[in-house]
Amino acid sequence: MTSLPKVLFLMGPTASGKTALALDMAEHHNCEIISVDSALIYRGMDIGTAKPTASELARAPHKLIDILDPLESYSAADFRADAVREIEETLSRGKTPLLVGGTMMYFKTLLDGLSPLPSADDAVRAQIAAEVEARGWQALHDELRNIDPVSAERIHPNDPQRLSRAIEVYRISGKTLTELTKIKAESLPYHMVQFAIAPQDRTVLHGLIAKRFQQMLAEGFIGEVETLKARGDLHLELPSMRCVGYRQAWQYLDGEFDHATMVEKAVAATRQLAKRQLTWLRGWPELHWLASGDEGNLDKLVQQSR
C-alpha cells in the first residue's frame, strides 16, 4: 500500500461524458477538479470548447479554465507547473485532486516529466529558414538523417515545424532530439490512479460528437466566433484559433465555404481529435476503463480509486 498522496486522472475523448462524471465525483467524494484541456484555458471561448456552464461550476469549481486570453500561448511545461501547484493546494485542503480532460500530452507531462529541450532561438530559426529557401526541406531532412537517424525516421520531410525544431535543438545544444528526449524530469511524488471513459462503440461516439456540435450552434457558437474575429488581433495561426470548430467557423465567416460544409468539416475534425485521443489511451499503462453512459461508473470510480 503506497503512502504517497492520491491523485485521480479521468481521461477520455471529446463528448464521452467526462464532465458529468467528474461533477458527481467532486460533489459526493471530497474531490476538487483540475482541468486538463488546452482549449478550456482560454477566456471568451466557452460554447465551442464545451466549457462547464455557470451552474456546473457552481456545483464544482474547475481549476485551470479561463486563465489566458486567446492571444496568449501556453506550453505543456506551463501546464505542468500550474497543475502541480493546484494539486499541492488541493491536497493541503485535505481534498483529492481529480484531473479531468482530453489533452493527452498534458497528462503525459505529469506522468513522465519534460525533456530538457532548449528554448527557441530566433537567430537559429532565421538561419534554418534561409537554408530551406536556398536548398529545400529535403536537404534539411537529409542533414537530420545524418545527425539523428531515429528522429529522421519519425519526422516526415513534409513536416516543416518538427523538422526545423529537430535541427534547431541540435544546433543550440549540440545534442540530438533523440538524446534529449531520453532525459526525463524527476517523477512527481503522487500515487496516480488513472481512468478513461469512452463509448464501447465508436459509432456512438461519432453520433455524440455530431449532436453536440449542433447543440453548440443552437447555443450561439457562430456568434462567439464572430466576437473573437471582431477583436482584430486574433488570427488562425494562433493555438487558440486552431481548436476544433473555431477554425472551421472562422473560415465559414470568411466565406471560404457554406454553412453545411462548415458543419461537416467541424464534425470531421472533432472525430479526428477523438480518434487521436483514443489512440493515446489504447497504449496508456495502468488504466481503468469506464463505458460512457454506464450508471455504475461513479461507484466503479470510487471503488477502484481506493
UniProtKB/Swiss-Prot annotation:
Keyword tRNA processing carried by entry: yes
Annotated GO biological process: tRNA modification
Residues that coordinate or bind substrate: 14-19
Keyword tRNA processing tagged: yes
Residues where ATP binds: 12-19
This enzyme's EC code(s): 2.5.1.75
Gene3D superfamilies on file: 1.10.20.140, P-loop containing nucleotide triphosphate hydrolases
SUPFAM superfamilies with a match to the protein in the record: P-loop containing nucleoside triphosphate hydrolases
Pfam families associated with the record: IPPT (PF01715)
Reaction catalysed by this enzyme: adenosine(37) in tRNA + dimethylallyl diphosphate = N(6)-dimethylallyladenosine(37) in tRNA + diphosphate
Renumbered residue ranges of the record's region Interaction with substrate tRNA: 37-40, 161-165, 242-247
Record-linked InterPro entries: Dimethylallyltransferase, IPT, P-loop_NTPase
Requisite cofactors: Mg(2+)
Gene Ontology molecular functions: ATP binding; tRNA dimethylallyltransferase activity
Annotated site, Interaction with substrate tRNA, chain positions: 103, 125
Keywords assigned by UniProt, alphabetized: ATP-binding, Magnesium, Nucleotide-binding, Transferase, tRNA processing
PANTHER family with a match to the protein in the record: TRNA DIMETHYLALLYLTRANSFERASE
Job of this protein: Catalyzes the transfer of a dimethylallyl group onto the adenine at position 37 in tRNAs that read codons beginning with uridine, leading to the formation of N6-(dimethylallyl)adenosine (i(6)A).
Assembly notes: Monomer.
Similarity comment: Belongs to the IPP transferase family.
Protein's name according to its UniProt entry: tRNA dimethylallyltransferase
Taxonomic source organism: Shewanella amazonensis (strain ATCC BAA-1098 / SB2B)
Gene field: miaA
